[in-house]
Amino acid sequence: MSDLFDEPDDATPLEPEERDGLLQSWVTTRADLNEAEQASIDKGAAWARRRRGRDMLSEDFVRLLHKRMFGEVWAWAGSYRRTGRNIGVGACRIPAEVAQLLDDVRYWVEHDTYDPDETAVRLHHRLVAIHPFPNGNGRHARMMADLLVQQLGRPPFAWGGADLTDIGEKRRRYINALQSADRHDMAPLLTFARSA
């Protein structure tokens, strides 16, 4: 894809006002955007790794991680979306849904409701389902899951060993696994998360 705002069929397109939030004037193609976002994500990941051991199950951390991951590229990074989407909860419900999710995860951890992998994958799935940000929700949710599973003593996930922003078989498997989780079957997403 060369057009800057072309999206894969299964991705969430940006609204015109969200597109205006692009901070990098050198970004003119989809490849440029992917490169800029990946560089910003890498810096966000390094920042998050330095914070190991600190509480990540807060709404402030959810937003700050997104800002650290995408803040060099998008002015709205770290801000919840204000528009409707074909996926996710209504924009007005995002803060309450994120707070409920974080409460649920704290409960799961405290009471050993699920093993560490399943706890982190459930966090990932629910964050994607809420879809709190204009863009970057899958990448952000995968980072949150990796951070949580590491806090729980397990290695980070491989997520199919591929760049899931690229259209291809791995992305299709990931989307299918998310759809299975939507139907309360977590096994495909757990398997995919640990696959290389």
Give, region by region, the residue ranges found by the protein language model.
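FIC/Doc superfamily catalytic core
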Residues: 1-196
